[in-house]
Amino acid sequence: MGADATGDTAARGDRAAHGDTASGGATGGTAGNIATVDLHPSLLPLAFLVGTWRGEGVGGYEGMESFHYGQEITFAADGRPALGYVSHTWWADEPRDGREPGSPMATETGFWRVQPPATEPGPDGKVNGSPVVEVMLAHPFGIAEIYVGTVTGTRIDLDSNVLIRTATAREVTRSVRLYGLIEGGDLAYAIDMEAGGKPLQSHLSARLHRSPS
């Protein structure tokens, strides 16, 4: 949904991200070398995200020709208990369907929050001791999403909890996201989507480099 609008998301983190997100933690940078002067204490598990990331990814879906896109994501801290989030994507493929390289594609805006780890057992009977992540996103094509998941080291697993759409928006019924740091300190992600009556499947994945401050 992030490029123009995941199945096992983790298995596809290396498809277009060109690397593997680590299980539980990731190789590369850590929060220790990120300036966190404006970071609310509750957001320390997400400190590794703070800053601007830029790179390229690949997208596709059943019935859709695959495509490449460029992306810039900014996670901003201002002292409050939520990271501000803005993502912009643009066409990075050959001209097609009226799109030229650099043509704007999609925008996501929202906030990321962290809650204490769950204390009650989940469906598997186990207590997940990882901090809970809540993500709220809005899209200009008529959809708003709330994701709930966990952060373990520098890996974040998210599943859509609420999807709201306008009467004219396309039908999206579920979205699953995986974010994580990979080798070299890059940020990789993969997004699976269930939409239009089609099963949950790979939609987007990318590898982003941290932009200089």
UniProtKB/Swiss-Prot annotation:
For this UniProt entry, the molecular function terms from Gene Ontology, in alphabetical order, are: heme binding; metal ion binding; peroxynitrite isomerase activity
The record lists the catalysed reaction(s) as: peroxynitrite = nitrate
In this chain, heme b is annotated as bound at 203
UniProt feature coiled coil, ranges: none
Cofactor annotation remark: Binds 1 heme b group per subunit, that coordinates a highly solvent-exposed Fe(III) atom.
Please state the pathway this protein functions in, per its UniProt record: Nitrogen metabolism
Q: Main EC class of this protein?
A: isomerase
Q: Which Pfam families match?
A: THAP4_heme-bd (PF08768)
Protein's job: Heme-binding protein able to scavenge peroxynitrite and to protect free L-tyrosine against peroxynitrite-mediated nitration, by acting as a peroxynitrite isomerase that converts peroxynitrite to nitrate. Therefore, this protein likely plays a role in peroxynitrite sensing and in the detoxification of reactive nitrogen and oxygen species (RNS and ROS, respectively). Is able to bind nitric oxide (NO) in vitro, but may act as a sensor of peroxynitrite levels in vivo.
Q: How does it assemble?
A: Homodimer.
* Description of its domains: Forms a 10-stranded antiparallel beta-barrel structure able to accommodate a hydrophobic ligand in its interior. In fact, this fold hosts the heme group, which is located in a wide surface cleft.
Regarding protein family, the annotation reads: Belongs to the nitrobindin family.
Recorded protein name is: Peroxynitrite isomerase
